[in-house]
C-alpha cells in the first residue's frame, strides 16, 4: 500500500507536519513544492512536470498560482522515523490573499520563501503577518541562492528589520537545482509543531476548499481536527444540518489517492455525493451523524468584494449555462459574489464582485475557457456610500443605480491603505504616481536600500491600472499590498457616455469632479478609435447630467454616388448628393451601432495619461 507506515504515524500525531508555503509572486513557491514532491517520491521522474501543482492552464501560462493545492507526502528523516507531510502551495498575488488565509487555518507552520536577489516585498509582509497572527511557526528560506545577483546577507537583515523574524539560521536553497531542499525538510520536521487532536473524540473536520466534479458531485478538501471519517459513514454538514453518506475519502500525493479513512491531524478529501452546489460551503464543519460534535469550528472571516463589474453573455441563449457556470465557480472560489442584473444595452447578465482586477480577469478567463462561454464585461467599479436628502444611507456598486443628483446629499468613496515597498532609487516616481491618484501620505520608513511608503488612496484609483503603472515607473521593483480603510466624503459625479444621443447604461462611470473633463475626453477619444465606422456619422459624447463635457465623431463610410455622372449639369450631381444625405439621415435614426468589448474596458483603462 502507498503508506505502509501510515497507521503507525497516525496513532502518533508527533509524526505529522502540516505546513504552507508562502511568498511573493515569482519567488519560487511552486518550484520548491516540485522539489518536495520529487524528493519524497510523490511522483516518478516521468510524471513530473514544472509547476506540477499549478493544474489550471491559466496558472501555467501566467506563471502564477491561483488555487491553493494540498499534497500529502512521506518523508524519512535522518532520525530514521517516517513523517507524514501535508503541505499547501498558496498563491502570492494580493488578490488571492483570502485563499492564503484559508490555507493557513489548516496548518501549524509556514515556510516563508524569499528571493535572495529581490528581497522582502510588500505581499510577503502581508501574508507573513497573517501567519504570525494565526500563531504559526514561520521558517524563513532564501531561494535562488545560486543567482549571481543573490545577496543573502542583505536579505537576512531585511527579513529581520522589516518583518521582525530571526533569520540568522535561514536555510539557503536553490529550488531550481535542488540545492539545500533536504535541509528545509529536516528543519520542518524539527521546528514545526505536530497537530493537536484526539482520534477518539467526535469528528470535527474543517472544509478548507470545495469544487464541483461532474461525476462525483462536490469534492471537499478537509482538515480533520478531531475524530476520524471513513467510507460508509454518515456525515453531517453542521451549518445546514443535512446528512450524507461518505462515498470516498483520500489524500493527494499529488494524484488523488483513495484511502479507507482519514484521522485527526490529516488533510484530505471527502466525497459524499452532494449534488447541490452549496451543499458543503467553505469554512463549514463536518461531523458524524451518529456521534455529532457539540461545537462548530471557527471558520473563516467572509471576505468582501472590492471591485464590481457586470458580466453578460454575448448570446442571450447562454444565460442559463452562464448561471450554472457561476454557481460551480463560486463553490470553488468563495470570494466570488454574483447577483442577476439586466442592462438596456446588454440584456440579462450578472453583477459580480471580485477581490481585485487580476481576480476579475482570471474569473472571466476561467468562465470562457472551462465553460465555453462568450462574455462581455462592463467597466469595473467600487462600492460607494450615498447619503440621501431623507437621511438614508445606500451602498451603490453600479453607476446606473445611482439616485438622481437632487436626491443626493453626500457621496463617500472607499479609501484603501496602500503599503508600497520600493528601492530608494525609484521613490520619486512612486510618490508622483500616488499624488496623481489623489493619495495622502501616511508614513515613510527607510530600512536598508528599501523604503516602505504608506499612502491612503481612493480605491477607485487603485483598482484600475495602478498596479501596472506602479510596476512600470519602478521597473518592476516596487511591490504593493493594500486593504480597505474607511469611507471618505468626496465630490463625485456620474458620467454618462452617449452613443448617437442615447445613454448606454453599461458605460456609465462614477468619477471625481476634478478629473471628469479629462477623463471624459480620454474615454471619447478611445471610443472613437474602437467603434468601427458605420454608413452614418456616430457621435460619442461624455455627459454629466445634461451637460456635455466631451465629444468625438466616428466619421461615416462614404460611397461616391456622383462617380457615374460624366460631365452634365451640376444639378444632377446635387440631386444625387441630397438623396444620399436623406438616406444617411434616415439610417442614423434607425441604425444600430455595435460596441466592441474593448470599448467597455476603455472606460477604466484611460484612467490617467500613460
From Swiss-Prot:
* Predominant cellular place of this UniProt entry's protein: membrane
> Do you know which Gene3D superfamilies this protein is assigned to?
3.30.70.240, Elongation factor 4, C-terminal domain, Elongation Factor G (Translational Gtpase), domain 3, P-loop containing nucleotide triphosphate hydrolases, Translation factors
What function does the entry list? Required for accurate and efficient protein synthesis under certain stress conditions. May act as a fidelity factor of the translation reaction, by catalyzing a one-codon backward translocation of tRNAs on improperly translocated ribosomes. Back-translocation proceeds from a post-translocation (POST) complex to a pre-translocation (PRE) complex, thus giving elongation factor G a second chance to translocate the tRNAs correctly. Binds to ribosomes in a GTP-dependent manner.
Tell me the keywords, alphabetical order. Cell inner membrane, Cell membrane, GTP-binding, Hydrolase, Membrane, Nucleotide-binding, Protein biosynthesis
Listed under GO biological process in this entry are: positive regulation of translation
Instruction: Kindly give the PANTHER family that the UniProt entry links to this protein.
Output: TRANSLATION FACTOR GUF1 HOMOLOG, CHLOROPLASTIC, TRANSLATION FACTOR GUF1-RELATED
Under what name is this protein listed? Elongation factor 4
| Listed GO CC annotations | plasma membrane
Q: How does it sit in the membrane?
A: Peripheral membrane protein
Segments forming domain tr-type G? 14-196
Annotated GTP binding lies at: 26-31, 143-146
Q: Name where it's found.
A: Cell inner membrane
Q: Which gene encodes it?
A: lepA
- Which InterPro entries does the entry mention? EF-4, EFG_III/V, EFG_V-like, EFTu-like_2, G_TR_CS, LepA_C_sf, LepA_CTD, LepA_IV
Q: Which HAMAP family does the protein's record reference?
A: LepA
Q: What is its EC number?
A: 3.6.5.n1
Q: Which family does it belong to?
A: Belongs to the TRAFAC class translation factor GTPase superfamily. Classic translation factor GTPase family. LepA subfamily.
Q: Describe the reaction catalysed, as an equation.
A: GTP + H2O = GDP + phosphate + H(+)
Upper classification of the organism: Bacteria, Pseudomonadati, Pseudomonadota, Gammaproteobacteria, Legionellales
Q: Which NCBIfam families match?
A: lepA (TIGR01393), small_GTP (TIGR00231)
GO MF entries: GTP binding; GTPase activity; guanosine tetraphosphate binding; ribosome binding; translation elongation factor activity
Pfam families membership: EFG_C, GTP_EFTU, GTP_EFTU_D2, LepA_C
Amino acid at each position: 500500500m502507498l503508506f505502509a507506515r501510515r497507521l503507525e504515524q497516525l496513532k502518533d500525531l508527533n509524526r505529522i507536519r502540516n505546513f504552507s508555503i508562502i511568498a511573493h509572486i515569482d519567488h519560487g513557491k511552486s518550484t520548491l513544492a516540485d522539489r518536495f514532491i520529487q524528493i519524497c517520491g510523490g511522483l516518478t521522474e516521468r510524471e513530473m512536470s514544472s509547476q506540477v501543482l499549478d493544474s489550471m492552464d491559466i496558472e501555467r501560462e501566467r506563471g502564477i498560482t491561483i488555487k491553493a493545492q494540498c499534497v500529502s507526502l512521506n518523508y524519512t528523516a535522518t532520525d530514521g522515523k517516517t513523517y507524514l507531510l501535508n503541505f499547501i502551495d498558496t498563491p502570492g498575488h494580493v488578490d488571492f490573499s483570502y485563499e492564503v488565509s484559508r490555507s493557513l487555518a489548516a496548518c501549524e507552520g509556514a515556510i516563508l520563501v524569499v528571493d535572495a536577489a529581490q528581497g522582502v516585498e510588500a505581499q510577503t509582509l502581508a501574508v507573513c503577518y497573517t501567519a504570525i497572527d494565526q500563531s504559526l511557526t514561520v521558517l524563513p528560506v532564501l531561494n535562488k541562492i545560486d543567482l549571481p545577483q543573490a545577496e543573502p546577507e542583505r536579505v537576512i537583515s531585511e527579513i529581520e528589520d522589516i518583518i521582525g523574524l530571526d533569520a540568522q539560521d535561514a536555510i539557503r536553497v536553490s529550488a531550481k537545482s535542488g540545492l539545500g531542499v533536504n535541509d528545509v525538510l529536516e528543519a520542518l520536521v524539527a521546528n514545526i509543531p505536530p497537530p493537536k487532536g484526539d482520534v477518539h473524540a467526535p469528528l470535527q473536520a474543517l472544509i478548507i476548499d470545495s469544487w464541483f466534479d461532474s461525476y462525483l458531485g462536490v469534492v471537499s478538501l478537509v482538515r480533520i481536527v478531531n475524530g476520524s471519517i471513513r467510507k460508509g459513514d454518515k456525515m453531517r454538514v453542521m451549518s445546514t444540518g443535512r446528512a450524507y453518506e461518505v462515498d470516498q475519502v483520500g489524500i493527494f500525493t499529488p494524484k488523488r489517492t483513495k484511502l479507507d479513512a482519514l484521522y485527526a491531524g490529516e488533510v484530505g478529501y471527502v466525497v459524499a455525493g452532494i449534488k447541490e452546489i452549496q451543499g458543503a460551503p467553505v469554512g463549514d464543519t463536518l461531523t458524524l451523524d451518529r456521534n455529532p460534535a457539540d461545537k462548530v469550528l471557527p471558520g473563516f472571516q467572509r471576505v468582501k468584494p472590492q471591485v464590481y463589474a457586470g458580466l453578460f453573455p454575448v448570446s442571450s441563449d447562454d444565460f442559463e449555462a452562464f448561471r450554472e457556470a457561476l454557481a460551480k465557480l463560486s463553490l470553488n472560489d468563495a470570494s466570488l459574489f454574483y447577483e442577476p442584473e439586466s442592462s438596456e444595452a446588454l440584456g440579462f447578465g450578472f453583477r459580480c464582485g471580485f477581490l481585485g482586477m487580476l481576480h476579475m480577469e482570471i474569473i472571466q478567463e476561467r468562465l470562457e475557457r472551462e465553460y465555453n462561454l462568450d462574455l462581455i464585461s462592463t467597466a469595473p467599479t467600487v462600492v460607494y456610500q450615498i447619503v440621501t436628502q431623507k437621511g438614508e444611507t445606500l451602498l451603490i456598486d453600479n453607476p446606473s443605480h445611482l439616485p438622481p443628483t437632487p436626491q443626493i446629499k453626500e457621496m463617500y468613496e472607499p479609501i484603501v491603505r496602500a503599503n508600497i515597498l520600493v528601492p530608494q532609487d525609484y521613490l520619486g516616481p512612486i510618490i508622483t504616481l500616488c499624488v496623481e491618484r489623489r493619495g495622502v501620505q501616511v508614513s515613510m520608513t527607510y530600512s536598508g536600500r528599501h523604503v516602505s511608503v504608506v499612502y491612503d488612496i481612493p480605491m477607485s484609483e487603485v483598482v484600475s491600472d495602478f498596479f501596472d503603472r506602479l510596476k512600470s515607473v519602478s521597473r518592476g521593483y516596487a511591490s504593493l499590498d493594500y486593504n480597505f480603510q474607511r469611507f471618505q466624503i468626496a465630490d463625485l459625479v456620474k458620467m454618462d457616455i452617449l452613443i448617437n444621443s442615447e445613454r448606454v447604461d453599461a458605460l456609465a462611470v462614477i468619477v471625481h469632479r476634478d478629473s471628469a473633463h479629462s477623463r471624459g475626453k480620454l474615454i471619447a477619444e478611445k471610443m472613437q478609435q474602437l467603434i468601427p465606422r458605420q454608413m452614418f456619422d456616430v457621435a460619442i459624447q461624455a455627459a454629466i447630467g445634461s451637460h456635455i463635457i466631451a465629444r468625438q465623431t466616428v466619421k461615416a463610410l462614404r460611397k461616391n454616388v456622383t462617380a457615374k455622372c460624366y460631365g452634365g449639369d451640376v444639378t444632377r450631381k446635387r440631386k444625387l448628393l441630397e438623396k444620399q444625405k436623406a438616406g444617411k439621415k434616415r439610417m442614423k435614426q434607425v441604425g444600430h451601432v455595435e460596441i466592441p468589448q474593448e470599448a467597455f474596458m476603455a472606460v477604466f483603462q484611460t484612467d490617467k495619461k500613460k
